[in-house]
Structure formats: C-alpha cells, structure tokens
C-alpha cells in the first residue's frame, strides 16, 4: 500500500500538475471570495441555508465561512473529478498493469485513494488560506468587520471549517470512486454521477422535502453548510458516514472479485 501511495504521489507531484493546480486554486479562491462577499445579505438573517450575511461574516469565523460557502457549490465538480480519476484507470488499462506489481487489490485501491485524498487535503489547506487572505483584503469594501478574524476563536473556527470541508471532499471522493469501480466505463459513470448529483437530487427535493434527509449529495451539502432547516449537521454527518461505509465495502468487494480485463 505504501508503494502505491508513493507511486500515485509521483504522478500528482509532477511540475505540470502542481502548476495547473496552484493557478486553478488561486483563481478559484480569489474569485469565490469576491463573489461570496458581494452576495452577502445586509440583513441579520440568512436568506438561504448556504447564504451569508454581513453580520455573520463579521464574526470570528467569518474569514473561513467565506471558504466553506464557496466550496459548498463545487460538490458536483469534486464528485465528477474523482469518478473520472478512477474510471480512466480502467479504460487505460492502468489498474491491470499496477496489479502485476501489487496483486493485493484492496491495498492497491486504498493506496490510490489515500494518495488522492492526501493531495486534496494539501490543496484544500492552500485554498482556505488564499480565500481567507483575499476575503480579508476585500471585506472592508462590503462593510464586513475583520477584527475578530485574527483571534484564537478565529483560528479554532478555521481548523473546524477545514475539517468539515475535508470530510465533505472525502465523502464525494469515496462515493465517486465506488461508482467508478462498479461501472468502470468513463462515459457511463460520468453520466450517472452528473445526473444524480446534479439535477436529479434537487428536482426530487423540490417535490419531496424529506429527500434532504436521505440523498447523499444533499446530505453532504447540508453538512458543509453547518446544517439546514431540514437536517442538522450531526445527522448529515452520521448518515453520510453510513453511506460512505457501504460504498467503500461495495467498491472493495467489486474490485477484489471482478476481473480487470482492460
């Protein structure tokens, strides 16, 4: 498993990958910080579960609240990226080649996922820092007070928000990887993933409010938002953890039992 992690990190730490990731992360962080601050409501109460107000952003955790609000809208993107990363390994025959050197399939799968999540964790940390810095510069233009951002409470909130977003990414990653391992076809896996996490869950939610308490994508959105009117963050966390456990078991069993012929 260690060898698999190292091998995957070699691919991820190539100069081209690092440059593209750094530029994309910086652009995303600055742009979304500006969008969140501009869209902040002047009222004392949020107009939606994922909205922010000038008052809420002026609290100690306001700086990283900008970050969590921004990334909460990128769930489908994260889901699709992990589907593609795993499904392409089948279409390119990479898994078949890797199994010649690491025949223990579950360790191979776990090693690849661990490396990707470790890389994602580093990218998230950088994104949070850049978003916070950009928000600190832009906040005065929207009458957002930033004095309490630089405090122990602000630091504690930053760590808490980082942990929440990391779990959010891990949830999408595991669900996306499981779908890719079961389906294997890149076009089909992407079609299912985009349709489900994109319009399907939200269309069903419009007709059936209880869907927010059961669908994984909606639960992940609720968790990273700190809870919604339909489901608390704690319930979302527990339910998503259950889904992730089941998805991981299905993916591991499927990968271990089925032939890798491509």
What label would you give each PLM region?
Residues 242-262:
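Junction motif at the cytosolic side of a transmembrane helix
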Residues 11, 87, 98-100, 176, ...:
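Helix-capping/transition residues at the boundaries of transmembrane alpha-helices
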Residues 82-101, 105-106:
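Transmembrane helix boundary and interhelical loop/hinge segments in multi-pass membrane proteins
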Residues 22, 96, 109, 190-191:
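Hydrophobic/aromatic positions within or immediately flanking transmembrane alpha-helices
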Residues 208-228:
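Short hydrophobic, aromatic-rich alpha-helical segments embedded in or entering the lipid bilayer
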Residues 1-27, 184:
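Aromatic- and glycine-rich beta-strand/loop motifs that create alpha-glucan
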Residues 17, 104-106, 110, 185-188:
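Membrane-helix interface segments
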Residues 18, 22-83, 109-181, 199-202, ...:
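Secretory targeting signals
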């Amino acid at each position: 498993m260690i060898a698999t992690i190292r091998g995957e990190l070699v691919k991820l730490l190539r100069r081209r990958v690092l440059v593209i990731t750094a530029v994309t992360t910086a652009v995303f962080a600055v742009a979304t910080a500006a969008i969140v601050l501009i869209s902040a409501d002047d009222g004392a109460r949020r107009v939606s579960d994922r909205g922010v107000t000038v008052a809420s952003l002026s609290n100690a955790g306001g700086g990283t609240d900008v970050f969590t609000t921004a990334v909460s809208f990128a769930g489908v993107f994260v889901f699709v990226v992990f589907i593609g990363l795993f499904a392409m390994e089948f279409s390119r025959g990479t898994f078949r080649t890797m199994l010649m050197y690491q025949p223990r399939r579950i360790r191979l799968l776990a090693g690849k996922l661990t490396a990707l999540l470790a890389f994602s964790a580093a990218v998230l940390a950088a994104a949070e820092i850049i978003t916070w810095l950009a928000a600190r510069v832009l906040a005065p233009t929207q009458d957002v007070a930033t004095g309490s951002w630089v405090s122990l409470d602000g630091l504690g909130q930053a760590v808490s928000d980082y942990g929440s977003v990391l779990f959010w990414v891990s949830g999408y990653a595991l669900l996306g990887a499981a779908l890719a391992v079961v389906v294997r076809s890149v076009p089909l896996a992407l079609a299912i993933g985009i349709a489900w996490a994109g319009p399907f869950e939200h269309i069903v939610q419009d007709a059936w409010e209880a869907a927010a308490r059961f669908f994984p994508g909606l639960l992940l959105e609720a968790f990273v938002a700190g809870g919604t009117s339909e489901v608390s963050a704690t319930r979302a966390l527990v339910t998503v953890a259950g889904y992730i456990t089941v998805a991981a078991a299905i993916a591991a069993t499927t990968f271990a039992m089925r032939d890798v012929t491509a």
